[in-house]
Swiss-Prot record:
Organism encoding this protein: Mus musculus (Mouse)
GO molecular function annotation: cAMP response element binding; cAMP response element binding protein binding; chromatin binding; DNA binding; DNA-binding transcription activator activity, RNA polymerase II-specific; DNA-binding transcription factor activity; histone H2B acetyltransferase activity; histone H4 acetyltransferase activity
Protein name according to UniProt: Cyclic AMP-dependent transcription factor ATF-2
Gene Ontology cellular component terms for the protein in this record: CCAAT-binding factor complex; cytoplasm; H4 histone acetyltransferase complex; membrane; mitochondrial outer membrane; nucleoplasm; nucleus; site of double-strand break
Keyword field: Acetylation, Activator, Cytoplasm, DNA damage, DNA-binding, Membrane, Metal-binding, Mitochondrion, Mitochondrion outer membrane, Nucleus, Phosphoprotein, Transcription, Transcription regulation, Zinc, Zinc-finger
Motif (Nuclear export signal): 387-396
Region (Essential for its histone acetyltransferase activity), start-end ranges: 278-281
Length: 487
């Protein structure tokens, strides 16, 4: 046994033998490649599975807090820059025209809660030509920031009373309302503002975007009293049930996102004469807004929104087009596929109709050509029958004695010498028949009866010629009659 396999494995615990050294080298290499796991584990020892799965990844992200909405790092910078700009602007305002609510209010204030789903109001503004007053001249800088409930353009009403500012802003936040106070009435000329108004839009994702509102008015000679209500946004908790307060900002943002989506999908009501038509909301908010409107306005002609502004007409159109684009982007894939199939079916039906008309025209043309071909074939058949009959007549009169007598009497020489006559007798009935055949063939309308009549007339004249040998010339009338009859 040891003689057959002299090569022994020197590995501990292995006593295998091999016949040659190559097998032993391969076996030793297997020992070297074997993994050493150490002692066997007990079943009680449990190793924690740390395989990175998507579920564990999401769990780790939630623990770290990556899914929480982070505040924009530029938000504070924007706020600080806007406050600095407001502070740097020259504010030479009379004490009666400041939009700050003082301790003593001349007339009782009226609270008006604007609904979130209201459509875009008309941005219109009027002020004096002495000073250019921007939008953000209120006491609180938050009046120029639109909260993330909706992206609505505020309705700005500015009347001039020695550079006085009256601002009405539709605050779309569900946790804010508007306090309206009365300003002293005075009549001043209205002139257009030379530039747009700056505005900061606070988006739902935490970003702040600057927006410029164009302000212009068509007539600069209109005198509008300054008895327009003075409006300043004040943070208040409304009594409408179901709307969370300002203490829970996260549910407010999620609800604002849902309402924004609902507002984009539904059709906005029209805007007429700058009066905002309230959207479908709770009856309490709509009733409050309707009751506060006649109290805030003393005279019906005091509003500056009676004069239409040029950018006010383009704003609803652009909003409608953008709404259509959003609806087209948010369409259901099944609806897109259904419309695609409808267009394909319509195109296929049009193609089939065009092809049917083309095939019908080809069939009609083929029928016309086949009828014309049949007519030509019938004419050819008639002409061939006529030629065959004429050949039979010629063969029948080939050995006729009249023809032999004409040849003997020298009819050919007499025919050649006579040049004063119009028509002469042909040299033979064969030539006469050929001449008649050519005439009838050229016309294409001769018949067998006419050919027989011509042949009999020629034979009759030839018989008369044989009875009168004294005449040297015979003028034949039948050939002249045969030609008009053939024609």
């Amino acid at each position: 046994m040891s003689d057959d396999k002299p090569f022994l494995c020197t590995a501990p615990g292995c006593g295998q033998r091999f016949t040659n050294e190559d097998h032993l080298a391969v076996h030793k290499h297997k020992h070297e490649m074997t993994l050493k796991f150490g002692p066997a584990r007990n079943d009680s020892v449990i190793v924690a599975d740390q395989t990175p799965t998507p579920t564990r990844f999401l769990k780790n992200c939630e623990e770290v807090g990556l899914f929480n909405e982070l505040a924009s790092p530029f938000e504070n910078e924007f706020k600080k820059a806007s406050e600095d700009d407001i502070k740097k602007m020259p504010l030479d305002l009379s004490p009666l025209a400041t939009p700050i609510i003082r301790s003593k209010i001349e007339e009782p204030s009226v609270v008006e809660t604007t609904h979130q789903d209201s459509p875009l109001p008309h941005p219109e503004s009027t002020t004096s030509d002495e000073k250019e007053v921007p939008l953000a001249q209120t006491a609180q800088p938050t009046s120029a920031i639109v909260r993330p409930a909706s992206l609505q353009v505020p309705n700005v009403l500015l009347t001039s009373s020695d550079s006085s500012v009256i601002i009405q802003q539709a605050v779309p936040s569900p946790t804010s309302s508007t306090v309206i106070t009365q300003a002293p009435s005075s009549n001043r000329p209205i002139v257009p503002v030379p530039g747009p108004f700056p505005l900061l839009l606070h988006l739902p994702n935490g970003q702040t975007m600057p927006v410029a509102i164009p302000a212009s008015i068509t007539s600069s000679n209109v005198h509008v009293p300054a008895a327009v209500p003075l409006v300043r946004p004040v943070t208040m908790v409304p009594s409408v049930p179901g709307i969370p307060g300002p203490s829970s900002p996260q549910p407010v943002q999620s609800e604002a996102k849902m309402r924004l989506k609902a507002a984009l999908t539904q059709q906005h009501p029209p805007v007429t004469n700058g009066d905002t038509v309230k959207g479908h909301g709770s009856g309490l908010v709509r009733t409050q807004s309707e009751e506060s409107r006649p109290q805030s306005l003393q005279q019906p002609a005091t509003s500056t929104t009676e004069t239409p502004a040029s950018p006010a007409h383009t704003t609803p159109q652009t909003q409608n087009t953008s709404g259509r684009r959003r609806r087209a982007a948010n369409e259901d894939p099944d609806e897109k596929r259904r419309k695609f199939l409808e267009r394909n079916r319509a195109a296929a039906s049009r193609c089939r109709q065009k092809r049917k008309v083309w095939v019908q025209s080809l069939e009609k043309k083929a029928e016309d050509l086949s009828s014309l071909n049949g007519q030509l074939q019938s004419e050819v058949t008639l002409l061939r029958n006529e030629v065959a009959q004429l050949k039979q007549l010629l063969l029948a009169h080939k050995d006729c004695p009249v023809t032999a007598m004409q040849k003997k009497s020298g009819y050919h020489t007499a025919d050649k010498d006579d040049s004063s006559e119009d028509l002469s007798v042909p040299s033979s009935p064969h030539t006469e028949a050929i001449q008649h055949s050519s005439v009838s063939t050229s016309n294409g309308v001769s018949s067998t009866s006419k050919a027989e009549a011509v042949a009999t007339s020629v034979l009759t004249q030839m018989a008369d010629q044989s009875t009168e040998p004294a005449l040297s010339q015979i003028v034949m009338a039948p050939p002249s009659q045969a030609q008009p009859s053939g024609s």
